[in-house]
Regions:
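Alpha/beta-hydrolase active-site loop
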Residues: 206-235
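The serine-hydrolase catalytic nucleophile loop
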Residues: 163-175, 189
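Primarily recognizes the serine-hydrolase "nucleophile elbow" in alpha/beta-hydrolase
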Residues: 226-291
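N-terminal cap/lid segment of alpha/beta-hydrolase-fold proteins
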Residues: 112-150
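Conserved alpha/beta-hydrolase
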Residues: 178-198
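Short beta-strand element of the alpha/beta-hydrolase
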Residues: 152-161
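Short beta-strand/loop motif that positions the catalytic acidic residue
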Residues: 370, 376-378
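Accessory cap/linker subdomain of secreted extracellular hydrolases
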Residues: 201, 268-369
């Protein structure tokens, strides 16, 4: 079977789970459960919602101190349980009881570890506003999370990885950034969820429906810029303290937005590629083959086939050789040679279009125009982005433009989503702390 992998897919969290009580039943989830909760001892946790590609609505528990990020499952309307790993329900390690105030909305959580003392955390005041962002002729549907209290507040725009992702595709990050005192803007990607338009990103490949003159990532950058302008025009927001965070493709895009918008306050690249897109695809071919356990002889075959189809796409030569090699792979039951892109090309014209308008894109030249502080985080064990190469390339490109406020870190045992491998029970150590400390110095936020 051909392995299908969306390039730079979202956060890469292991969303598949065993059968569970349906959290979408009436009364099981209400929006008042989502938010930031603070204990009297300074312990801060978040409850976020996530909607999977299949439309399932899931709930995440995040402990910003320990790094635990796991799915929780309903026992009753206001009692939920968390198991020992991301998707496991049993044996239960934590029981979460939502406490309601006089109006019936959630005002806090009671946390009952199976082995440990109980604690209570009060829900932090937070304004949640549905918004519409104009981007050219399109309309992006989103949500603005505003801190309570007098502004103007520093703010952050969250940018998606590739794929049909919505404002609920950011895992623990919306409320994590909110817990730091930032206003947070999240939105449905163009052509996804409630946003209008057609989605074009690194995962869509060569599309005949692309508008004339389209080049990747034009529309993504247009939407990121529109989100920035939207925040800049809000009276609650400090226009001099608006920055970007993105994961995967969104991490790359955060740096491009900072290059375009000279008044951006900061940019955070989480696992984003830094180099030509074709180079990242070629890296993925070998890394994913090894991750699937293929022997090195087969990894070599994968890389040779990857080099072949990319050469054909770049030069237009030897298309017949590519078709013959692909047909042979299918005939010989070697579908492991193919990925979703090389397996789906139907013509040389399509391959050439993909190269000229998407695969040849290189984010590095624009980085010489970035003047704001930049943070880059990559996972040591990421099979989708070459972490050492990306970190080095980003540092060098920014330095060439004279940017001296550049921080890069490769997270030990981190995955593409920066979850800790091998079991993905939590964010890898250092992720939340690094973001928090770095932003305190650059975004003017106080201690929670």
């Amino acid at each position: 079977m051909r392995i299908v992998v969306w390039l730079l897919l979202g956060l890469g969290l292991p969303w598949l789970a065993p059968a569970a009580p349906d959290p979408t039943e009436p009364g099981a989830i209400d929006d008042s459960k989502f938010g930031v909760y603070r204990g009297s001892d300074g312990h801060v946790v978040g409850i976020d919602q996530f909607i999977t590609d299949s439309g399932e609505r899931a709930v995440l528990y995040s402990d910003y101190q320990s790094g635990v990020v796991r799915r929780i499952f309903p026992i009753s309307q206001d009692e939920w349980g968390m198991g020992p790993s991301f998707a496991a329900q049993t044996p239960r390690e934590l029981t979460i009881r939502f406490v309601r105030g006089a109006t019936g909305t959630v005002s806090g959580v009671s946390l009952h570890p199976t082995n440990g003392p109980r604690s209570f955390a009060a829900k932090s005041p937070l304004i949640r506003e549905a918004v519409t962002i104009g981007s050219g002729s399109e309309r992006l549907a989103g949500t603005l999370l505003l801190p309570a209290g007098k502004g103007p507040h520093p703010a952050i725009v969250l940018l998606h990885g590739s794929g049909p992702l919505t404002r609920h595709s950011f895992g623990p990050y919306p409320h994590f950034f909110s817990s730091l005192g930032l206003a947070v803007l999240i939105f449905d990607k163009r052509g996804t969820g409630e946003s209008t338009g057609t989605r074009f990103d690194a995962s869509t490949g060569a599309l005949e429906s692309a508008p004339k003159g389209y080049n990747y990532p034009d529309n993504l950058l247009e939407d990121a810029s529109a989100a920035f302008r939207f925040l800049r025009n809000r009276p609650e927001i400090d226009p001099g303290k608006i920055g970007f965070w993105g994961s995967s493709e969104g991490g790359m895009l955060a740096t491009q937005a900072a290059a375009k918008l000279q008044d951006a306050a900061f940019a955070i690249n989480s696992s984003g590629f830094m180099g030509p897109l074709w180079q990242t695809l070629h890296y993925q071919a070998g890394a994913l083959a090894r991750e699937r356990g293929l022997p090195e002889s087969q990894v070599d075959e994968v890389l040779a086939f990857s080099a072949l189809w990319m050469r054909v796409a770049r030069t237009g030569d030897d298309y017949a050789q590519f078709v013959e090699a692909r047909n042979s792979a299918r005939h010989e039951d070697k579908d492991w040679l193919l990925n979703w892109r090389s397996g789906d090309f139907t013509s040389l014209q399509q391959m050439r279009w993909d190269w000229e308008h998407t695969l040849s894109f290189d984010p590095l030249p624009a980085l010489q125009s970035v003047t704001c502080p930049v943070l880059g985080l990559w996972g040591e064990r990421d099979p989708l982005t070459d972490a050492p190469r990306a970190a080095k390339s980003m540092r060098e490109a920014l330095a060439a433009g004279g940017n001296e406020d550049v921080t890069t870190r490769i997270i030990a045992d981190g995955s593409h989503s920066l979850m800790e491998l091998p079991d993905r029970r939590r964010m890898a150590p250092g992720v939340f702390d690094t973001l928090k400390e770095w932003l305190r110095d650059r975004a003017g936020i106080g201690r929670p």
